Regions:
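N-terminal secretory signal peptides that target proteins for export/translocation
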Residues: 1-4
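Bacterial N-terminal signal peptides
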Residues: 8-18
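Hydrophobic small-molecule pocket/channel-lining residues, especially in calycin-type beta-barrels
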Residues: 22-179
Length: 179
């Protein structure tokens, strides 16, 4: 083997060793869109007024919603229970590839749903599709952040004519210590 060939082999082996010895890339960090979800983290007392509808009895109800930040800070897990509404478990995340917020949930009465969300100033708007008993229902949830510890919400169901009918309106509050 010539000295040129020997030098080439040594250089190739050296560069290969360097490439293999490099540390793996650092895991991604949550971006500003993910950080917006942190608003919801904490234990909330939710007071809702259910309007007359064909799904749940009308009336006032009080429940709790506990939201926790998932490992890595990329999503928020949510558990809502108490009152007349079914217990629900779900999560909200920001899909940085599709550039949209997403939500998924399931309830104690077999209702499952998926939605996409946008945030504009202090207002979150979620377009959801609920599935229950073989039917698909489109809806819209609007959340308006009033302060770091208070928000209002409204769930509306598509009426089939291009409009929406309000099903639930409410407000939520949390103590500062719950954050």
């Amino acid at each position: 083997m010539s000295s040129r060939s020997s030098v080439a082999v040594i250089l190739i082996c050296g560069f290969t060793s360097l490439l293999l010895a490099q540390a793996p890339p650092a895991p991604p960090k949550p971006g500003p869109e993910h950080k917006k979800l942190e608003y919801f983290v904490g234990k909330w007392t939710v007071e809702d007024e259910i309007k007359p509808n064909g799904y749940v009895p009308a009336g006032k109800t009080v429940g709790t919603e506990t939201d926790t930040l998932g490992p890595g800070g990329f999503y928020v897990e949510s558990r809502a229970e108490g009152g007349q509404l079914p217990t629900r478990f779900g999560f909200m995340a920001y899909d940085s590839h599709a550039k949209v917020y997403t939500s998924y949930y399931a309830s104690s009465v077999g209702l499952v749903g998926v939605g996409t969300g946008t945030v504009n100033g202090n207002t979150w708007t979620w377009m959801v599709e609920d599935k229950y008993a073989g039917k698909s229902v489109k809806g819209r949830t609007t959340i308006t952040m009033l302060s770091p510890t208070q928000y209002t919400s409204k769930y509306e169901m598509a009426d089939g004519k291009g409009g929406y009918t309000t099903i639930v309106e409410g407000k939520a509050a949390q103590s500062r210590s719950a954050r």
